[in-house]
Amino acid sequence: MSGATGERPFSDILTSIRYWVIHSITIPSLFIAGWLFVSTGLAYDVFGSPRPNEYFTEDRQETPLITDRFNALEQVKKFSEVN
């Protein structure tokens, strides 16, 4: 038989009760876990990105743009220092 891999056909998997019992639990669980990861702020801590209220400080209200590519590290240090 050419083309037979011995695997279960995809249509059989999708019409299986077992498939939907497993995935009716895992898909909403992944969605809820992702929502909690972002809404609790843990995503900001894990990836090191600033929270929305940390983009601008009291002293610096302008957009922190890097303008000199050769002295970029000094500019980043200046922007990230806490006053």
From Swiss-Prot:
InterPro entries assigned to the protein according to its UniProt record, in alphabetical order: PSII_cyt_b559_asu, PSII_cyt_b559_asu_sf, PSII_cyt_b559_CS, PSII_cyt_b559_N, PSII_cytb559_asu_lum
Topology versus the membrane: Single-pass membrane protein
Segments forming a coiled coil: none
An individual GO BP term: photosynthetic electron transport chain
MF-aspect GO terms: electron transfer activity; heme binding; iron ion binding
Keywords carried by this UniProt record: Chloroplast, Electron transport, Heme, Iron, Membrane, Metal-binding, Photosynthesis, Photosystem II, Plastid, Thylakoid, Transmembrane, Transmembrane helix, Transport
Binding site residues for heme: H23
Cofactor, how bound (note): With its partner (PsbF) binds heme. PSII binds additional chlorophylls, carotenoids and specific lipids.
Compartment(s): Plastid, Chloroplast thylakoid membrane
Cofactor names: heme b
One of the record's GO cellular component terms: photosystem II reaction center
Alphabetical list of NCBIfam families matching this protein: cyt_b559_alpha
Function: This b-type cytochrome is tightly associated with the reaction center of photosystem II (PSII). PSII is a light-driven water:plastoquinone oxidoreductase that uses light energy to abstract electrons from H(2)O, generating O(2) and a proton gradient subsequently used for ATP formation. It consists of a core antenna complex that captures photons, and an electron transfer chain that converts photonic excitation into a charge separation.
UniProt record similarity statement: Belongs to the PsbE/PsbF family.
Complexes and interactors: Heterodimer of an alpha subunit and a beta subunit. PSII is composed of 1 copy each of membrane proteins PsbA, PsbB, PsbC, PsbD, PsbE, PsbF, PsbH, PsbI, PsbJ, PsbK, PsbL, PsbM, PsbT, PsbX, PsbY, PsbZ, Psb30/Ycf12, at least 3 peripheral proteins of the oxygen-evolving complex and a large number of cofactors. It forms dimeric complexes.
Annotated protein name in UniProt: Cytochrome b559 subunit alpha
Species assigned in the record: Chlorella vulgaris
